Amino acid sequence: MLDREGFRPNVGIILINAQNEVWWGKRVREHSWQFPQGGIKFGETPEQAMFRELEEEVGLRAEHVKIIGRTRDWLRYEVPDHFIKREIRGHYKGQKQIWFLLRMVGRDCDVNLRLTEHPEFDAWRWHDYWVPLDVVIEFKRDVYQRALQELSRFLSRPAHPAPIHNTARYLRQTHSARKTDEPSTEQTKPNNE
């Protein structure tokens, strides 16, 4: 289902935990990371599509999350021609998305990436709200930045852009999900420095 301009209605999901860390999923057999997203089916509201995609891609149900906010308007990105199937070139331009900010109220063990026959992700992790977006496929980076920026106003404490260190490299490394009782591996400076 495309609009008159050739954009497919879609939802995007920014899932945060109690520390305002963001859930990132690694695409199956790829080295790129992204947020859960998916198309809105005929007759679905954006909220219904969001809950369906959240369960299909992450394994979480409505009782595992709380809706914190959503974007005011559609955010669009165009898909380069070489990513578009030949038979729909000329008609399909890209995606227009309503983005939702969700707080996870469930536990990390509630995440199930293998709920469907064709999973989207093969790994996941929590990371700072502001992270360099070079691990995201290039044509989606701008819409990610706009969604993160617009939805940051709903965070319970300010999430300011963090200094860019090696966070992009961190997303590329293989890690298992961090347990909430494990100490952070980040080093902190003493207050007198």
Swiss-Prot record:
Span list, region Disordered: 174-193
Any one GO molecular function term: pyrophosphatase activity
Co-factor(s): a divalent metal cation
> Nudix hydrolase domain location, by residue?
6-149
Q: Which CDD domains match?
A: NUDIX_Ap4A_hydrolase_plant_like (cd03671)
Function statement: Accelerates the degradation of transcripts by removing pyrophosphate from the 5'-end of triphosphorylated RNA, leading to a more labile monophosphorylated state that can stimulate subsequent ribonuclease cleavage.
Identification of the protein by name: RNA pyrophosphohydrolase
| HAMAP family reported for this sequence | Nudix_RppH
